[in-house]
Design a protein with these regions (language model features):
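Long, contiguous internal "core" modules enriched in hydrophobic/ aromatic residues
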Residues: 3-11, 20-26, 81-82, 120-129, ...
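Membrane-interface transmembrane-helix boundary segments in multi-pass integral membrane proteins
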Residues: 14, 34-36, 55, 130, ...
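Alpha-helical transmembrane segments of multi-pass membrane proteins
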Residues: 19-40, 103-109, 173-181, 367
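Juxtamembrane/interface segments at transmembrane-helix termini
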Residues: 34-43, 75-87, 109-112, 324-330, ...
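Membrane helical hairpin/interfacial module
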Residues: 49-116, 128-131, 135
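Hydrophobic alpha-helical transmembrane segments
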Residues: 62-70, 140, 284-292, 359-363
Length: 384
């Protein structure tokens, strides 16, 4: 199938330069702190919060990659041709976000190179965490193969379609294992629920959708008039509708979790009362609900500036939500006693914040390289 080249804004070297600078600075600080202090550079420990901001960052980026694949699958798997004009760009960003999440996890493990041989040589077949790594690795490979097919103008052959379906299946399996890692921990009541994988599924789709909106505007200079007819039609029609619908579903999930947690008197769920006293929770809620109300207006949701602002607000809110989900599940002490505080205090260190910068920098750097090397605006001729 032939490829139709979309009209892209000129390559912006600012993204490439900023991502390189962020990568160099963040890696330098993290490596220095790890060399000087070891894992003590992170404000986590085995007595309380053992998974902190780095794990929340990892979850955020890999689930954003998952959501981007869901968005691309609307065209690749379910044949909604209106999404084809952004599929190639979205698939490449999914690869970049996944590698950004892996980079954060590698440094959080304490020794970023030891895992290359330690994990394969200590294969734990009964561990969801182990299979999460296997399926995410398979998912990455399938994404790269699918992108190679698209880059070679093979969009809809039998093998290309099978790769798209296989990538979707692999990421669902990886996503299910990631949700199970949290949802199967009975000693952590905030996480322990069959709802956890479903919550991850809904928020992953939303984060992928808003990331697709932001990267599309970035590629076109944040102006709809720079877009091709196919991209502009998508951004004025189906895409904001998809964002609004998925945002409404996520708000219901958040409301259900909070309401259930506040109503229940089960030990360990008192953390939901503490969340209501958190400024971050209210910022998250205001960003989600406010964006949803704005997108309900048909006239407003078609405007580029509104889409950019709401997408950015929702993406930040989802990052806050990932942090709250990961950390709040651990702040209730497992072992009670008069010497144990009601809730464990945790504040991310500079090294942990630098891993956020590292993940974002890796993601944008890989995306910028792809923007420079490939025609990310290409789409099948039949979709235009």
């Amino acid at each position: 199938m032939s490829t139709h080249a979309q009209a892209n804004a000129p390559f912006n070297p600012v993204v490439l330069g900023a991502s390189i600078a962020g990568f160099v600075v963040s890696v330098g600080i993290v490596l220095y702190m790890l060399n000087a202090q070891g894992h003590a550079a992170f404000n986590t420990n085995n007595d309380g919060v053992s998974w902190g901001l780095p794990i929340a960052t990892y979850v955020f980026f890999v689930l954003t990659s998952t959501g981007l694949t869901f968005v691309a699958s609307l065209a690749m798997v379910f044949n909604l041709k209106g999404f084809y004009p952004v599929v190639k760009r979205v698939v490449w960003l999914a690869v970049a976000a996944l590698l950004g999440g892996f980079a954060c996890l590698a440094f959080e493990l304490g020794h970023p190179f030891r895992m290359l041989w330690a994990i394969p040589l200590s294969f734990q077949v009964t561990s969801p965490m182990n299979w999460m790594g296997v399926f995410y690795s398979l998912y990455l490979l399938l994404l790269l193969l699918k992108f190679h097919k698209m880059n070679a103008n093979d969009w809809d052959s039998g093998s290309s379609r099978k790769l798209g379906i296989a990538a979707l299946v692999a990421v669902i399996l990886a996503h299910g294992n990631l949700g199970a890692i949290f949802g199967m921990l009975a000693m952590r009541p905030v996480w322990y629920s069959a709802q956890s994988p479903l919550y991850f599924l809904a928020t992953a789709f939303l984060s992928g959708a808003v990331a697709a909106v932001l990267i599309t505007y970035l590629a076109h200079g944040f102006k709809q008039e720079n877009m091709s007819e196919g991209v502009r039609k998508l951004m004025k029609g189906a895409m904001p509708n998809v964002v609004a619908a998925s945002l409404g579903a996520v708000i219901l999930f958040v409301a259900a979790r909070i309401y259930t947690g506040l109503w229940s008197n089960a030990d360990g769920l008192e953390v939901f009362d503490a969340q209501l006293r958190s400024v971050w929770f209210w910022l998250e809620l205001i960003a989600l609900v406010g964006s949803f109300l704005v997108l309900l207006n048909r006239r407003l949701r078609g405007q580029g500036s509104v889409q950019i602002l709401t997408a950015a607000a929702v993406l930040v809110a989802l990052f806050i939500g990932r942090y709250e989900f990961v950390v709040s599940g651990q702040v209730v002490p497992l072992f009670k006693g008069s010497w144990v505080p009601g809730l464990i205090e945790y504040t991310p260190s500079l090294s942990e914040w630098m891993l956020v910068v590292l993940s974002l920098s890796v993601t944008l750097l890989i995306y910028a390289v792809g923007e420079k090397m490939f025609n990310l605006g290409g789409s099948p001729q039949s979709a235009n």
